[in-house]
Regions:
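Flexible "cap/lid" loop of the alpha/beta hydrolase fold
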Residues: 47, 83, 91-132
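Active-site acidic short loop of glycosyltransferases
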Residues: 2, 27, 62-64, 87
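Active-site signature of alpha/beta-hydrolase-fold catalytic machinery across serine-
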Residues: 20, 80-84
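Structural motif
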Residues: 4, 65-67, 91
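Conserved HGGG/HGGXW glycine-rich cap/lid loop of the alpha/beta-hydrolase fold
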Residues: 2-42
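Gly/Ala-rich beta-loop-alpha elbow adjacent to hydrolase catalytic centers
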Residues: 70-74, 78
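Conserved alpha/beta-hydrolase catalytic His-Asp/Glu region
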Residues: 127-143
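Active-site loop/oxyanion-hole signature of alpha/beta-hydrolase fold enzymes
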Residues: 32-69, 105, 110-111
């Protein structure tokens, strides 16, 4: 039986973007949520709002603790989930987690409260303007 691993994607990239990586790990059974924070789970004030999405997935899909791997935003969400429910995790591998100072977190909270975070956060701007349709694979490879 294959070792089970859960993967949490980075902000702005659905989990399927990592399929080439997953294909290189055939010895593992890799589970994931395609788009964290969509559907009935939403970020209202903090990334911690998505912990129930992770824990609900684990409870529905795993009968024992699993290794979890998170990239960027996904790493942070998994850390919050592991903090709240360590019983669900064998361990956690965090790839490139964003670590934000108190000043930055405070500024982000104020901008969210004022409803201007999409206008002033560079990553949010890039994600909102990212194309999802391209003329060819060759075109994408040049980017």
């Amino acid at each position: 039986m294959k070792e089970k691993i859960f993967f949490a994607h980075a902000n702005g990239f659905p989990a399927e973007v990592y399929n080439d990586l997953f294909k290189r790990l055939p010895q593992f059974d890799i589970g994931y949520i395609s788009k964290l924070g969509h559907g009935s789970y939403k970020i209202r004030s903090s990334w911690k709002d998505l912990v129930p999405e992770i824990t609900d997935y684990f409870e529905a899909n795993y009968t024992e603790p699993v290794w979890a791997i998170g990239h960027s935003f996904g790493a942070v969400i998994l850390a919050f989930a592991a903090e709240q429910r360590p019983d669900l995790f064998k361990g956690l591998i965090m790839m490139d987690p964003p670590v934000l100072s108190r000043k930055i977190r405070w500024a982000m909270a104020i901008s969210q409260f004022l409803g201007i975070s999409d206008k002033i956060m560079p990553l949010a701007k890039k994600a909102a303007n990212r194309s999802d349709c391209f003329p060819s694979k060759a075109f994408v490879a040049k980017k």
